[in-house]
Amino acid sequence: MIKRLRNYWINRTTRRRFLLGTAGGGFGIMGAGYAYMRLWESGWLETTRRNVPLKQPGATIKVLHLSDLHASRVISLAYLRRAFGVGLEMKPDLICITGDFITWKYKQYDAYAKVLRALSDHAPTFACLGNHDGGSWAEGRMKIGTSSSQPVRDLLANANIRLLHNDHTVETINRREINLVGVGDLWNDECNPNTAFAKLDDSRPTVLLSHNPDSKDLMRNHPWDLMLCGHTHGGQVFLPGLGAPLAPVKDKRYVRGLHQLGDRWLHISKGVGNLHGVRLNCRPEVSLLNVS
């Protein structure tokens, strides 16, 4: 009887230790995974280079495409400065930023403008606004955004970055004239392509800046050759076999990379910043497009 009781307590203690050890190991793996997503991959910049042959061939223009900077508590200006440095090392001729300069309300605008100015000091720099940059969606989201995009507009002006908000302009780069068009954000109900493309001379190649790739459906009947987008963060969490289930778009076919749509091209940046400071199988991206 005594022997049976001793074996019972030994087995029970061993089982308890096993269960506690297994639980501890599981929590350890989870902790290590979270640390990887937050402390490593979220700041592990990836540089991509892609060729974009337009239907109207001409001199090659090197376009640096940046998106979703998301300056915030978790995305520091020091990190953005480093990302810009990586991009400028590729010696772009033109820089395009497709929105979400901030995440919610922001205070360090003067310091931010100085960091952004490194871009415009190097090459002509253009931008459109994203859903976090102010508007009806930004104001309504948990009441920590703002209804006005004026602070971000002022930021861009102070950084010598030209905002294209339902507007277009003509730029000559490497002796090649191109149209640059920018539209307002889809989620903020400010995307107005009819205004943006009004009186556009479509004999020139046209590069379109629009934060949300779902807006492509509104652009179907307008003349553009290359559309630059962000918004998705590439899904931010990319799972084998599942793709990017968290990507905030209706059309999950287009969440990252370069896509050919007939004789047009769509490029979606995975973004430089992120929300909540984490990424998984989806490194932040600095893209150079060789547009020819």
What residue ranges belong to the model's regions?
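Binuclear metal-dependent hydrolase catalytic cores centered on His/Asp/Glu-rich metal-binding motifs
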Residues: 137-161, 165-168, 173-210, 216-217, ...
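N-terminal active-site segment of His-dependent metallophosphoesterases
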Residues: 24, 28-113
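Core catalytic region of metal-dependent phosphoesterases/phosphodiesterases
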Residues: 78-172
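N-terminal secretory signal peptides and thylakoid transit peptides that target proteins
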Residues: 3-26
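Active-site-proximal beta-strand elements of phosphoester/diester hydrolases
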Residues: 60-70, 177-185, 207-210, 265-271
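Active-site neighborhood of phospho(di)ester-bond hydrolases with catalytic His/Asp-centered motifs
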Residues: 66-67, 95-99, 125-131, 164-166, ...
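Beta-strand-turn-beta hairpins that frame and shape the catalytic cleft
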Residues: 54-63, 161, 169-180, 260-265
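Conserved beta-sheet core of the metallophosphoesterase superfamily
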Residues: 213-287
